Amino acid sequence: MAVVIAVVAGLAGCSSTGGKRAEEAREQGASGKANVTTPRWKVAMVTHSGDGDTYWDIVQSGAKQAAAKDNIEFLYSHDKEAGRQAQLVQAAIDKKVDGLIVTLAKPSAMKKVVKKAVKAGIPVITINSGQEESKDFGALTHIGQDEVLAGEAVGRELNDRGKKKAICLLHEQGNVGHEQRCEGIKKTFDGKVEDLYVEGTNMPGVQSSVEAKLQSDKKVDTVVTLGAPFAATAAEAKKDAGSKAEVDTFDLNAKVASGLKDGTIGFAVDQQPYMQGYESVDLLWLYRYNRDMLGGGKPVLTGPQILTKKDAGKLEELTKRGTR
């Protein structure tokens, strides 16, 4: 079972915003000048991430920043297999955490244990995936992007670029959010979209599958990947296939920022993972301290944001810092 646990300790100033104030708070914490007088609450984040997915490094970066500011002990664990993810949530319940952040990529497997956490009096916030199920499961709110709307934004961008046939590369079967992204593209794209399923933990296999598809279907002029780590792989497959198809992607990392700059990637759809991590921890602190909550019963949206070559310069700097 793949389990990663990280603990972040820190004392810092009270603020529900990031940026300069958060940096100042972290500096205060390092020097022992804490403004937060709340108890040292323990917050657990349990995600569906597989090993080596850099997206979740960025989420953790935001969560750790907020934890340092809010005097929170932050625990992180993950497993791509839904049953084992549910077991990790149960482990957090057993630890009597003061708050729980969880993803619902495969909601049916998570429903029982999330409701159990709520029944135990643990405030829950869902992030990234599970927007439609979040409220029903008893979560306070959901933080992330509306995946259908994000897909629709991609479809419109492809229309603007004059594209006619796209592959939607699904790297995790059963992930509801990924399926919604492809559905959204199909809603607004005037051309044709074909789903291509690959095993996301096998990058050589991903590259071979994309290359074979591009070689067999010369009408494909776009490959849309659903995660930043797969964009560079798709670009290599395109090169080896001798294809002129454009590679576009959901999410952002350093390689994607570099690809936007050199033209190997056309555009990226960013859902701001740093913000998902930061705001989820900060909102749990606000809720426990003052019963505050954002969204008014609606999801707190962090995306989508279309990023192109014109954004690449600044993005390269931020991705190297680990916050975009």
Name what the model sees in each region.
Residues A9-G13:
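C-terminal motif of bacterial Sec signal peptides marking the signal peptidase cleavage site
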Residues S15-G18:
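Bacterial signal peptide processing site
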Residues R26-A66, D70, L75-Q87, L104-P107, ...:
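Extracytoplasmic "Venus flytrap"
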Residues E73-K96, D195-D217, A231-T233:
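Structural motif
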Residues Q85, T141-A166, P204-Q207, L252-V256, ...:
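Hydrophobic alpha-helical segments within soluble ligand-binding/sensing domains
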